[in-house]
Amino acid sequence: MMLRWSGIWGLYPPRIFPSLLVVVALVGLLPVLRSHGLQLNPTASTIRGSEPPRERSIGDVTTAPSEPLHHPDDRNLTNLYIEHGAKPVRKAFPVLDIDYLHVRTPFEISLWILLACLMKIGFHVIPTISSIVPESCLLIVVGLLVGGLIKGVGETPPFLQSDVFFLFLLPPIILDAGYFLPLRQFTENLGTILIFAVVGTLWNAFFLGGLLYAVCLVGGEQINNIGLLDTLLFGSIISAVDPVAVLAVFEEIHINELLHILVFGESLLNDAVTVVLYHLFEEFASYEYVGISDIFLGFLSFFVVSLGGVFVGVVYGVIAAFTSRFTSHIRVIEPLFVFLYSYMAYLSAELFHLSGIMALIASGVVMRPYVEANISHKSHTTIKYFLKMWSSVSETLIFIFLGVSTVAGSHQWNWTFVISTLLFCLIARVLGVLVLTWFINKFRIVKLTPKDQFIIAYGGLRGAIAFSLGYLLDKKHFPMCDLFLTAIITVIFFTVFVQGMTIRPLVDLLAVKKKQETKRSINEEIHTQFLDHLLTGIEDICGHYGHHHWKDKLNRFNKKYVKKCLIAGERSKEPQLIAFYHKMEMKQAIELVESGGMGKIPSAVSTVSMQNIHPKSAASERILPALSKDKEEEIRKILRSNLQKTRQRLRSYNRHTLVADPYEEAWNQMLLRRQKARQLEQKITNYLTVPAHKLDSPTMSRARIGSDPLAYEPKADLPVITIDPASPQSPESVDLVNEELKGKVLGLKRGPRTTPEEEEEDEDGVIMIRSKEPSSPGTDDVFTPGPSDSPGSQRIQRCLSDPGPHPEPGEGEPFIPKGQ
């Protein structure tokens, strides 16, 4: 029985075989590359193989020894002479030689990065698997397989060193999150995020540590020697939500912005609590006695670590913004300042045991608005894509090395301790979210629903930060560190695999609001700022100094002092609202070009253009034209609809995105109708035709004039115009002949008027030609002209040589030549 490839998990051979071949080749090369290298020279191979060199470990790779060890019998190999009989014979020049130790470190790092990139490509090529299993789970599985293969061939798998993780892999992820942080959402929910990050993490650490200490007392001889400080330290490590795991899972399920910023903001800001508790309990473990003063100093260190990290980040962010002011002549190095200053902020914070994550976030948030105002658009694109690429590769390497380190590490298993840790983590998370949400909802305008609380509790994932902190434990002070590391890996695997794989179907089952992918329009931005100013004025009138008041004060200070120092040129003086009007006019111009109406742009003053207001001109010249009542009513409708949308966004805390525009289809249809009307008007203007019907318009035949050479005898019913040849341009020289006769003849010949046109002549000599359209099926859905803007009613100034439409000569009645 033959099976079709398309029926086996949706796999397709051309898609999966190249990825599998490359992966198998890389995995097969790794054990070989981790050896001491291949030598084509047998003498050198014997000498180097007799005594293996000592190796120095840097992170997850092993570097070559600084000084090669030579065999004692190695005498003057540089002369390349070998004794052969009685004559000294010079050795042949080596055509090919391999020195793997020279390129070992960068080559292995490149192989791991290449493996990570190929894994990401392979997962997205197979959409069936990636839609069910999160990418982080698949990467951990790949790490387990690679580690098992390396260990199976007798080699030692590389281990994820804590220094490599904290100094090289973690900063790109945090910088990407901090630089592109949605600042408005973050500040509007800052109180809720801080409560979850600080109070929630403290609750989880002490609740978990206390219960685990009680379990250790009754758990058996293997865990009886674990003290209270040990369990509290372990609780502080395992209680923090990991930002890498949260980003990896929440970006795939596209959860709404409120829940995403709450969970992700908690994972970012709980770093200060984790660092303080970790160093506090680590120091207390070496003390013989812990006093009240030590506890007070530990409490004080929390503010020093958190606020100190923020201060370091702000300083480096301001320096980066000020430096970017002078890079207008050297655009190439602009992105480099963003990366270097941010990384130096992280390293400076780690130098003083401050929160490096807080420093990175603060530096990214502070420098972004000023740097983007100074740098070019190409530099901005470079920064964006480089940060995304760097963070994506780092995240992939972290999850792969989690799997490899699980195979390489030494483990100690205890069912009681591991299962208790897993259960207490879940219980502490659920209780903490429920209690804190009950307290938070008393002060929030937009309450957190039970569905939101469930997603927040279920999204508390653990990751590589807990693993790296557990690996840093000293075995001298913590003899049970192997048991702690095993329990940490178990919790990480449970949260990433079980919770990460089931959160997507649970979100769909509970019908939790998803993220809106549409971008915010200029109209949305303008009215959002209008509401901010309105709420600021209301707070001033009421005497209540809320966050709108302080935000307005900060914006005024920023505009008056900071922008002048950090932003170069005139860009710091341009009002933001005028910039939005400029964007709106540009958008309207693009729409006109796309609709084909660029040649018909009116020359009147735009009602939305702020460029028409000249500050130095007279007051009478700055008055905008008066609007009609229809225009005012249309503006009221637009404002009313947008204010209603903004109020709905405030209820859902989703103000930075737009729902699907219900008027978009009507707007497109209106553009299509305008385009058809312009095309019809252009035909009328170019060809002097007045259509009675859009499908069959009668043409207009030109009347003959007296100065025309008469090759044929004209018909009697045609009017003759006599023009004085002395002054043919003067209107007095034009004599309209047989005008009344033409009307009578036309009336007698044609009978009642059947042409769907009606002529009316006013006092100025302007003919009003109104076309009557007969009802025909299928014409209503094409275009229905109105009484004012339709080309059916045209005011055409009568030409002196054109008496108007008249019947064409009938077929078969040619002109007779004169004199015949």
UniProtKB/Swiss-Prot annotation:
Post-translational modification Phosphoserine, affected residues: 603, 606, 609, 652, 697, 701, 707, 727, 730, 733, 790, 801
Organs and tissues of expression: Widely expressed.
Domain of life (superkingdom): Eukaryota
Signal peptide (residue range): none
Post-translational modification: N-glycosylated and O-glycosylated in the N-terminal region.
Phosphothreonine carried by residues: 607, 755, 784
Membrane topology type: Multi-pass membrane protein
Spans within the Cytoplasmic topological domain: 126-134, 181-190, 254-256, 327-332, 376-377, 443-448, 510-820
Interaction with TESC as annotated region, ranges: 505-571, 637-820
GO BP terms in the entry: cardiac muscle cell contraction; cardiac muscle cell differentiation; cell differentiation; cellular response to acidic pH; cellular response to antibiotic; cellular response to cold; cellular response to electrical stimulus; cellular response to epinephrine stimulus
GO molecular function: calcium-dependent protein binding; calmodulin binding; identical protein binding; phospholipid binding; potassium:proton antiporter activity; protein phosphatase 2B binding; sodium:proton antiporter activity
GO terms for cellular component: apical plasma membrane; basolateral plasma membrane; cation-transporting ATPase complex; cell surface; cytoplasm; intercalated disc; membrane; membrane raft
Remaining remarks: Predicted models used for more than 20 years predicted 10-12 transmembrane segments. More recently, the structure of SLC9A1 has been solved and reveals that SLC9A1 possesses 13 transmembrane regions.
Biological role stated in the UniProt entry: Electroneutral Na(+) /H(+) antiporter that extrudes Na(+) in exchange for external protons driven by the inward sodium ion chemical gradient, protecting cells from acidification that occurs from metabolism. Exchanges intracellular H(+) ions for extracellular Na(+) in 1:1 stoichiometry. Plays a key role in maintening intracellular pH neutral and cell volume, and thus is important for cell growth, proliferation, migration and survival. In addition, can transport lithium Li(+) and also functions as a Na(+)/Li(+) antiporter.
Quaternary state and interactors: Homodimer; dimerization is crucial for its function. Oligomer. Interacts with CALM1 in a calcium-dependent manner. Interacts with TESC. Interacts (via residues 504-563) with CHP1. The interaction with CHP1 occurs at the plasma membrane in a calcium-dependent manner. Interacts with CHP2. The interaction with CHP2 occurs in a calcium-dependent manner. Interacts with EZR; regulates the cytoskeletal interactions of SLC9A1 and promotes stress fiber formation.
Protein name in the entry: Sodium/hydrogen exchanger 1
Organism: Rattus norvegicus (Rat)
Lineage of source species: Eukaryota, Metazoa, Chordata, Craniata, Vertebrata
Gene that encodes it: Slc9a1
